[in-house]
C-alpha cells in the first residue's frame, strides 16, 4: 500500500502510531489508516513563495482537463460533459466560472486522502453537498464487447462530479491573477463523508490542509475562472484512466 503513496515503508512515510506491524502500526480502524498523515517534509510544497505556482491538492492521477466549461450541458448517452450548474449545484457564484478551466484527478483506495490547498488565500465559502452513493452512468463501461469493463466506475468520474456527495471550498487566492477558485472533493462509491477542516474567513498557505475523504476511493476537481491563464504540468502524462499519481503539493500548473 505504501508504494501507491511513493515509497516502500509505511513507517518511513507516514506518522504511524507504532512501528509494530503486528499491532497494525497502531491504527485503530480502517478509516484511521485511510486518513493517515505523511511525516513532515515527505511532501514539500512546490515553490512556497511563488504564488504563480499551483500545487497539487491531492495525491492523485490526472483524469481529465476541460477548457471553456459551459454553464449548462446535456448528459448524453455517450460521453460525460461537465456542467457547472450541476457540479456546483447552482451555487450563486457558479456563473463566475463559466468558460473557465477544470482539472479532475482520481484517488484510488490506496492513495493519500487528505486535501491540501493548491494556492495561498482566504477561505470565502465552504460547505458539504449531499449526493448519491454508488451512482453510475449506465452508458459507460461497455467498451469491451467480451466482458464487463473493470474500470467502469473510474470511467464515469465526470458524471459523479454532478451527482455524488461532495465538498465545496471556494478560495480567494492571494495572487490577483488567480482570484476566486474552487476545490471540489467528490466521493465515489460509498464515500459519504467529505470532512472539511478549514473555516470561512481562515487564511491558508499553499499546501495547508483543507480536509479529507473518509473510507474509500475518490476524485476531485480544481476549477478556475476564464480570466485565469494556466500552463498545466501533467508530469509527462496525458490525462486518462492509465495515469499514475502526481504527489500532493507538487507543482501542477503555472499561472501565465
Q: Predicted regions span which residues?
A:
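Contiguous, well-folded functional domains in the mature portion of proteins
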Residues: 1-256
